[in-house]
């Protein structure tokens, strides 16, 4: 079982893969989950729009699409992250790009752990959980 990082049509972001993978595992454990096979696919806005249209029938850009293959307490999935939208969100929300990237990385893991963000009040709960996870992000990743 592994956490893997790929770049689809862009360059892989400069993240500390080993430290980030350890952080992901630590966050998952706080929800009573173990990590299975998790693939991060970093891509452009155009690629994530293509994935959104093809698999979800959504015609818009987004920062992350999570395909959940979780079985029991072992989380697994493919997570597409648009680095273009991450950059736009960092500018929009006046946050550091690196922080926004790690927020997006953990956002997908939180979905795999069962946290939603579409219903009433769920977005706030998701943000609280993201903030809790970011608080334990290893210093070398900041």
Curated annotation (Swiss-Prot):
Zn(2+) binds at residues 107, 111, 117. Its main location: cytoplasm. Its cofactor is Zn(2+). Its EC number is 3.1.-.-. It is found in: Cytoplasm. GO terms for cellular component: cytoplasm. One of its GO terms (biological process) is rRNA processing. Keywords: Cytoplasm, Endonuclease, Hydrolase, Metal-binding, Nuclease, Ribosome biogenesis, rRNA processing, Zinc. It comes from the Bacteria. It is an enzyme of class 3 (hydrolase). Signal peptide: none annotated. Binds 1 zinc ion. GO terms for molecular function: metalloendopeptidase activity; RNA endonuclease activity; zinc ion binding. InterPro entries: MetalPrtase_cat_dom_sf_prd (IPR023091), YbeY (IPR002036). Single strand-specific metallo-endoribonuclease involved in late-stage 70S ribosome quality control and in maturation of the 3' terminus of the 16S rRNA. Belongs to the endoribonuclease YbeY family. This is Endoribonuclease YbeY. It comes from Parabacteroides distasonis (strain ATCC 8503 / DSM 20701 / CIP 104284 / JCM 5825 / NCTC 11152).
């Amino acid at each position: 079982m592994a956490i893997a990082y790929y770049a689809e049509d862009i360059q892989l972001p400069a993240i500390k893969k080993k430290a980030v993978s350890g952080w992901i595992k630590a966050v998952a454990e706080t929800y009573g989950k173990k990590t299975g096979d998790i693939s991060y696919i970093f891509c452009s806005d155009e690629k994530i729009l293509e994935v959104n249209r093809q698999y979800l029938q959504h015609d818009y850009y987004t920062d992350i699409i999570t395909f959940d293959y979780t079985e029991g307490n072992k989380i697994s999935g493919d997570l597409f992250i648009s680095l273009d939208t991450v950059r736009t969100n960092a500018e929009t929300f006046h946050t550091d790009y690196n922080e926004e990237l790690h927020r997006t990385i953990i956002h997908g893991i939180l979905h795999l752990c069962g946290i939603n963000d579409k219903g009433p009040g769920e977005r706030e709960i998701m943000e609280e959980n993201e903030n809790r996870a970011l608080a334990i992000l290893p210093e070398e990743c900041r």
